[in-house]
């Protein structure tokens, strides 16, 4: 093609028309039918995740080899259990549930005196001392050499919460009830105290893992490859949430999904279908 005009005339591109009166501070360039779908959800819902939940990122160790160990490692039995935390990685998060993880985190920030914990210091973390000392926070004297780079507050992990990967092909939101810690490529959120009697974790994952909410999120998500999307909290926590007469039904079906998965059953399509229909009915889509 010798000109843009000729290229456009050839009709090999999809055309989108934007009207000034529909443009707000957040530009969303989408098909008309997708905008109708998106707007129905935005207009119907009275809450967003950021209204009812607190979000946080996983831990940055600064050197995974020093702090993350396989549960099958023979030496793990030598470590005091109070320093070992369940460690969840991105790939272990599925819809609704988390796969059995293979790893444990040594939460070394709880070590008050390195001489009191010679096994952890000498047999595990100490092997990487030189590398750990080169971390920016250690050079600035903000961290002891054996501490995690960004260990966060333990309390935010040691509670019921919803975890999700920061990159995914689809919505994957899982309930964690095992006080799991996670790597930095996993984000989590928990329901704020004032909303604990209004929303349940089971209801939220029922919505978020549905076909409707998968489509809804992707309309405004950043696409990073042919099929993968960013799931950063700046977009995830803006997801709109509703509560209406279908709340109990959706919550109950979601609990049934969780029970089946915990029992080792993989076929949940019938329950997902029912959840999706209830959501569509509520939203009028």
Which role does the model predict for each range below?
Residues 23, 27, 37-55, 243-285:
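Non-catalytic DNA-recognition/assembly elements of restriction-modification systems
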């Amino acid at each position: 093609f010798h000109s843009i005009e000729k290229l456009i005339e050839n009709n090999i591109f999809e055309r989108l028309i934007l009207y000034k009166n529909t443009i707000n501070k957040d530009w969303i360039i989408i098909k008309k039918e997708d905008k109708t779908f998106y707007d129905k959800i935005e207009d119907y819902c009275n809450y967003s995740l950021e209204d009812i939940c607190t979000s946080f990122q996983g831990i940055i160790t600064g050197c995974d080899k020093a702090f993350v160990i396989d549960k099958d490692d023979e030496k793990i039995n030598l470590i005091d259990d109070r320093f070992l935390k369940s460690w969840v990685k991105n790939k272990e998060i599925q819809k609704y549930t988390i796969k059995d993880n293979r790893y444990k985190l040594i939460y070394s920030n709880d070590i008050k005196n390195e001489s009191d914990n010679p096994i952890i210091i000498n047999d595990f973390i100490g092997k990487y001392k030189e590398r750990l000392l080169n971390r920016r926070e250690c050079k600035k004297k903000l961290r002891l050499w054996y501490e995690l780079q960004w260990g966060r507050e333990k309390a935010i992990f040691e509670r019921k919460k919803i975890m999700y990967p920061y990159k995914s092909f689809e919505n994957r939101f899982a309930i964690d009830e095992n006080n799991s810690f996670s790597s930095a490529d996993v984000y989590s959120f928990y329901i704020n105290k004032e909303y604990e009697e209004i929303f349940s974790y089971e209801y939220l994952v029922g919505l978020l893992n549905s076909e409707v909410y998968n489509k809804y999120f992707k309309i405004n998500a950043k696409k990073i490859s042919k099929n993968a999307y960013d799931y950063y909290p700046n977009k995830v926590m803006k997801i709109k949430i509703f509560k209406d007469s279908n709340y109990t039904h959706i919550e109950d079906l979601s609990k049934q999904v969780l029970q089946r998965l915990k029992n080792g059953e993989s076929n949940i399509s019938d329950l997902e279908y029912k959840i999706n229909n209830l959501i569509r009915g509520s939203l009028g889509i």
